[in-house]
């Protein structure tokens, strides 16, 4: 009789632990990071950060030199690659990925890499999904390096990304890898673009306070999922899906 009671008590304890664990799990899943969504007017391809983005005339690059200027105007400052005090392009060294090409930069950088002239310090547009922070996102507290989810209303695909660059007040730009990951067959930043308002960005303000840097998209995806972020847009407002 005593053994039955003892076993029954053990069973109750086990059930209680199981229920408490389930409740804790549900509570954790219920904690969603604050976010908001923006429908872009268009989306141009940004190749900044790629080591072969810009180079001397005659080299095979992902973009034209004009696009390295702010707002793509020749009379504006150069923001797409590093220049010296005489405003001359700083070339990559012999041990860099593309020797002789210009060092293309992004606003988000690897803070553990103190070498400003190392192309690896910047977000490679060929390998990482990133969006450009526009004025609207900045006013709502989005920081460079924060996570985002991006959805194409045309291809019906959703992916994780980070806020990797600035420089376009509209925010209507995304990395080459981002557009390709969304299903667009783009090759470079010279002429490729999404001309319709069909790309939706979900921003997660202050979601990367430690400025974690990523060298592969799989690392970025893993970090986003650990935070409980979502690339599912099925429950978004009708205008965003």
What does each model-identified segment do?
Residues 14, 22-25:
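Cleavable N-terminal signal peptides
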Residues 1, 18-19:
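Intrinsic low-complexity, intrinsically disordered segments enriched in polar/basic residues
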Residues 2-9:
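Bacterial N-terminal signal peptides that target proteins for export
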Residues 10-18:
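Bacterial N-terminal signal peptides
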Residues 26-157, 161-164, 181-189, 194-199, ...:
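Cell wall/extracellular polymer interaction/catalysis modules
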Residues 168-181:
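Short, solvent-exposed secondary-structure boundary/capping segments
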Residues 22, 168, 206:
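Residue-level marker of positions within ordered structural domains that often coincide
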